[in-house]
């Protein structure tokens, strides 16, 4: 969907409300053709209709959402000037602390926990008058690539409910693809926004590390985690990106730098003269031929738009996966030590006779799932005396080499492109017992996390009726380049196929 609905909002009745873009929804609300309550009720009705099948949501706050929508309508009626996303419904990944809603991180160890404060991104969404529908399903503590690691059951892909939606932000992606919400917020540690975006036919963006606050984001890997948007269009993603970005003194890793002009870039749609580098290392064995064909067609479209396309080598990208699976579990081992049964969350075996260590052990055994335990053990081992330098230390050196690859590449080109994932969505259960095969789903996305730069996944086409994506990567704090290239390519691909890709998603 590439239409610019801001200037020409579609009135209710001519198009199903839940299928409107976020920009179109906001524009219709702003001029009174649609109320925020109507938009919210439409989303809630859609959730009631399809979410038993999709299982995108862990918690739906219907009362809170409708109250927020009424506030938007009342203030608009009073003549108050509202923001560009006022009244637009949104699904929130259940990894952000949210006052008034449970925050579980997809884990039994936090089941029923209600945080007393909002994450900064949640506060900014409320300030922007975005309507929070509820909390979306996810792999436990964001550890996974399929959303099968959720303690509360898997989410299903709206394109084929026998297949995974990707992960760890699979609930957020499925909610948008199933037209339960026009927008969703996810997190990306090694591809957890971009991979599900690709597998569900969406736009997903990992902003520059430090560009969006992590305060209130329950940490998996602190040097890699980043919040970002999932949407049906590049412009919608840009509007959400702009709403959550900016310096936050509550986050020590937040960078005090100007927010890139992502909305203007998304609407520019002119990439003549831009230099685009195709990453040589992301092709060949392990890549589905259909994925490679869709990627080649997208690259051809970039050439047709006037971009200068060249091949670029990033030789250390091939070491990204093993480096990531030492760094991320090491940080996870440290971060998840806070779940000790003493301060919040689950407590098992506290019979008045057991000591604190025994209670903690029983609680963590009962509360953490298999993948979380696997990564804690791996990280603890990598950080242990005698192994730190050989494993964690070496992985950090590889991380530096990958950052240097990016620096060298961006001296030659403005952006890099690759497939987002090696394959389309695979069947539920197909890789649960093969962790390495599961980890390979993030082969193309991990380098941007290790280097801290921004990256976007954009729908590139269908393979056997399933969506796949093209990834666009840019230098740190050049997030606007993603949107400039993404907006132009989205329009070209939609024109080429005669309609937005999501028009082909099967009805549920």
Curated annotation (Swiss-Prot):
Q: Which species is this record about?
A: Frankia casuarinae (strain DSM 45818 / CECT 9043 / HFP020203 / CcI3)
Q: What does the similarity note say?
A: Belongs to the amidase family. GatA subfamily.
Cite the InterPro entries for this sequence: Amidase, Amidase_CS, Amidase_dom, AS_sf, GatA
The subunit field of the Swiss-Prot or TrEMBL record says: Heterotrimer of A, B and C subunits.
Q: Which UniProt keywords apply?
A: ATP-binding, Ligase, Nucleotide-binding, Protein biosynthesis
Can you supply one Gene Ontology CC term for this chain's record?
glutamyl-tRNA(Gln) amidotransferase complex
Query: SUPFAM superfamilies per the record?
Result: Amidase signature (AS) enzymes
Please identify the protein, giving its name as recorded.
Glutamyl-tRNA(Gln) amidotransferase subunit A
């Amino acid at each position: 969907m590439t239409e610019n609905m801001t200037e020409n909002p579609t009135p209710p009745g001519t198009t199903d409300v839940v299928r409107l873009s976020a920009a179109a929804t906001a524009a219709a609300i702003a001029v009174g053709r649609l109320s925020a309550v109507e938009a919210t009720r439409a989303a809630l009705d859609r959730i009631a209709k399809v979410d038993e099948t999709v299982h995108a949501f862990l918690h739906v706050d219907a009362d809170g959402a409708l109250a927020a929508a009424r506030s938007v309508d009342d203030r608009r009626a009073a003549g108050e000037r509202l923001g560009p996303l006022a009244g637009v419904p949104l699904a929130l990944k259940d990894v952000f602390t949210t006052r008034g809603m449970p925050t579980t991180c997809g884990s039994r160890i936090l089941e029923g926990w209600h945080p007393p404060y909002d994450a900064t991104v949640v506060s900014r969404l409320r300030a922007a008058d975005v309507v929070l529908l509820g909390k979306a399903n996810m792999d436990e503590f964001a550890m996974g690539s399929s959303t099968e690691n959720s303690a509360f059951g898997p989410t299903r892909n709206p394109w084929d409910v026998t297949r995974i939606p990707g992960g760890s932000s699979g609930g957020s992606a499925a909610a948008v693809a199933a037209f339960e919400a026009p927008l969703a917020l996810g997190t990306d540690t090694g591809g957890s926004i971009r991979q599900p975006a690709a597998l569900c036919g969406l736009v997903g963006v990992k902003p520059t590390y430090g560009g969006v606050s992590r305060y209130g984001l329950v940490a998996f890997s602190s040097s890699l985690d980043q919040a970002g948007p999932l949407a049906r269009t590049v412009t919608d993603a840009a509007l959400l990106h702009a709403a959550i970005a900016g310096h936050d003194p509550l986050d020590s890793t937040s960078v005090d730098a100007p927010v890139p002009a992502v909305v203007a870039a998304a609407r520019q749609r002119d990439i003549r003269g831009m230099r685009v580098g195709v990453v040589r290392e992301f092709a060949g064995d392990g890549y589905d031929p259909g994925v490679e064909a869709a990627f080649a067609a997208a690259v051809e479209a970039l050439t047709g738009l006037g971009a200068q396309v060249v091949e670029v080598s990033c030789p250390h990208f091939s070491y990204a996966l093993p480096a990531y699976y030492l760094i991320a579990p090491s940080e996870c081992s440290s971060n998840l030590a806070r779940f000790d049964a003493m301060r919040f969350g689950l407590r098992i075996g506290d019979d008045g006779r057991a000591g604190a260590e025994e209670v903690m052990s029983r609680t963590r055994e009962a509360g953490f799932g298999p993948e979380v335990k696997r990564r804690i053990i791996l990280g603890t081992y990598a950080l242990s005396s005698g192994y730190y330098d050989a494993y964690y230390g070496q992985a950090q050196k590889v991380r530096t080499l990958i950052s240097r690859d990016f620096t060298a590449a961006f001296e030659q080109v403005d952006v890099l492109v690759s497939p987002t994932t090696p394959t389309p969505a695979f069947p539920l259960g197909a890789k649960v017992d093969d962790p390495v095969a599961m980890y390979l789903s993030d082969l193309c996305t991990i380098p941007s996390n290790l280097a801290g730069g921004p990256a976007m996944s954009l729908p590139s086409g269908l393979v056997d009726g399933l969506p796949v994506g093209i990834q666009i990567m840019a230098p740190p704090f050049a997030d606007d380049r993603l949107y400039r290239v993404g907006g132009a390519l989205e329009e070209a691909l939609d024109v080429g196929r005669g309609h937005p890709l999501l028009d082909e998603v099967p009805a549920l």
